[in-house]
Amino acid sequence: MCDDDVAALVIDNGSGMVKAGFAGDDAPRAVFPSIVGRPRHQGVMVGMGQKDSYVGDEAQSKRGILTLKYPIEHGIVTNWDDMEKIWHHTFYNELRVAPEEHPVLLTEAPLNPKANREKMTQIMFETFNSPAMYVAIQAVLSLYASGRTTGIVFDSGDGVSHTVPIYEGYALPHAILRLDLAGRDLTDYLMKILTERGYSFTTTAEREIVRDIKEKLCYVALDFEQEMQTAASSSSLEKSYELPDGQVITIGNERFRAPEALFQPPFLGMESAGIHETCYNSIMKCDVDIRKDLYANCVLSGGSTMFPGIADRMQKEITALAPPTMKIKIIAPPERKYSVWIGGSILASLSTFQQMWISKQEYDESGPSIVHRKCF
């Protein structure tokens, strides 16, 4: 099990993207959408080699004729058959490895249902015959990647956001807050406000176009009201985007109105605190002695923290909530899109971690519930 020549696999299963690769690498080898697509129409061409399902980039490129489904919603696997397809694709098509030869480190969202990690464990050992596996919490890995052991991680991906306070390497579960508001909701909101401008995006395939618009053109305003006035009085904030059919659309205040929903969830009709307030509430649930260390180490991670301007806005909002003399530092590493994966790569290659793996033998003796005893 502890042979040095067998690299562990690290798979970060996000709601939007799967990041996969080998422990010890500095970036994931394979990054592809967590999508399974099935044809919407009957195949008429014989010998075309049509498949009954497509995964990842192939599903994305054929999206015009497919119905796209995401098996992971809000960080929780809702469709295990599709999830198995995605893992199969990861091992055999993307990484080209035999899963029975490599230990595998999987990631999961904090506060996930226990049954979820048991099922993950079961599939790895029984379907893919993994020699060993481990399930790690995403936010903790992001903190590893930033080179810290204490801090509060705001992790926001496509399906779910969390604030996770971590002290000396331990996540503090009573203070973890979860917000079901993330990239996919922002994409849907952008679809809605673009419709108000007269552009119609409705299908699952068109949603992917809007996601691309969001990733390329959106940003977070430092002062929302001020920015709205600027947008109304001049066209300096307008940008154009070319759709796949060559039509060009113009997008103005939508560029910062969409990500603003992170700070003002009522925009989406959600009655919850914004991300700045959620971070603050999370810190306030911690012991008074460690709050200073958390304020000074607010780490952003995940794809939905990639909007330009988000770190400055967080700094401004948290400063307004915190005690006046408190030193507040927002850490936004440039590679934060992949920091969960990078943290997993670091963890799985530590020599001290090697006794933490759940081995096939232990699984055979104890069954899926072993995961709660060995992974925390």
Curated annotation (Swiss-Prot):
The text of the family note is:
Belongs to the actin family.
| Residues recorded with modification N-acetylaspartate | 3
Q: What does this protein do?
A: Actins are highly conserved proteins that are involved in various types of cell motility and are ubiquitously expressed in all eukaryotic cells.
- In the Enzyme Commission scheme, what number(s) does this protein have? 3.6.4.-
The protein's matches in PANTHER family, at most eight in alphabetical order, are given as: ACTIN
Q: What class of enzyme is it?
A: hydrolase
Query: Which SUPFAM superfamilies does the record associate with it?
Result: Actin-like ATPase domain (SSF53067)
Species per Swiss-Prot/TrEMBL record:
Mesocentrotus franciscanus
This protein's name = Actin-15A
CDD domains on file? ASKHA_NBD_actin
